[in-house]
Amino acid sequence: MKILLVSTQDYIHHPIPSRHHNIFEELATRHEVHVPHFHVSRGKERETRLHVHEATRFPVESPFLHYTANAPHHYRVIREIIRDYDIDIVVGAHVLAGTAMIRAAKRFNVPVVFDLKDWFPDSAAAYYKNPAVKRLIREGVLAITRYNLDHSDVITTVSPGLVEKLRGYGYEAELITNGVNTDLFRPLDGGAMRTALGIAPDAFVLGFAGAVERWYALDEVIRALPEIRKRHPNAELLIVGGSLFTGYLEELQALAADLGVAGRVHFTGAVDYRDLPGYIAPMDLCLIPLSPPQWVDIALPNKYFEYSACGKPILSTPIPDMLRMGGDQIAVYRNREEFIKRVDDLALTPGRCPTGMEEHSWKKKAEAFEKIFMRLTGKR
């Protein structure tokens, strides 16, 4: 089967592999998969099995400006890929490039699967602080997203909450949750990494791994650390990852210094994704401090799968879909006082949790997409 993927990200330079990287690299072992390259990130180029087609005329780093300025060129490149490579099915998750994808696919009568990996109106607005700008972005992206959904043959999405949200807008979606590379993410000994990071062997390590952006309230975690250290002087915080488009990481570093805990907060910056399990290994308690209330009801973060596959206990804000999936390894907090209390309890009873993530492997998720593609095309 010949597949065209239109990803939400710079497919070969984005520092954090998305669900599309994990699923379509697996599909590319048995299908011909093409992807246009939106050169909006400046990270190290990653290897890929996909056929990459340059789709950037104006290499602007601002996502809004990049996708707006390059929109006509994106359409031409996507149209040419569909025509020249006899594409059987198009799948993607993008706002402006999603519209280009749909219009080009319909021109050649190629079926479209729209994979909505988050609620774009809110995620697009999250990068902006000005309320008027946020509202303008949210309303504009909602209109474009609805156009894209209206003209897709099948809609897939990542969480039961997002299925319900879409139903409220009049759309039926098929659920394919995020997953985890169970060959890569597994329990590991964290002793060597503690030494490398300057963390004491007996430290109680709270940890976070992922994009360091404002939708994760890491500032509140740092503000709680002085009180936690009064109760547990061996407590330290490990933050693994970098900011994507904002200065949030630098703000957190300044906050830690202002609170006098800079020596107990370890920032690694962005790390290679394949090294991530090694950085999770020294964590005694893994954090998911998801903040925006409009996201909580539709979220099912990759972190849940990755932390769980590594056998780690999780402390999270209340994320309904994650809690529905269950697991004794999950504890919940709603405010700073509850956060400190949960850390206090868990610091006294640290331990490894069962993994049980095999059914959520990316290979299983790739098979689920494959079944949809075969249903729409009649091809294997």
Labelled PLM ranges:
Residues 240-241, 249-275:
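Nucleotide-activated donor-binding/catalytic signature segment of Leloir-type glycosyltransferases, i.e.
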Residues 1-44, 85, 228, 319:
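N-terminal subdomain of nucleotide-sugar transferases
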Residues 4-6, 156, 200-225, 238:
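Conserved donor-binding/catalytic core segment of Leloir-type glycosyltransferases
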Residues 328-337, 343-348:
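Conserved acidic donor-binding segment of nucleotide-sugar-dependent glycosyltransferases
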Residues 186-199:
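A short helix/loop element that forms part of the nucleotide-sugar donor recognition site in Leloir-type
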Residues 161, 179:
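Carbohydrate-associated surface elements
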Residues 14, 216, 272-279, 286-308, ...:
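Nucleotide-sugar-dependent
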Residues 22-23, 76-80, 99, 103-107, ...:
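Membrane-proximal helix-turn-helix segments that form the acceptor-binding/catalytic region
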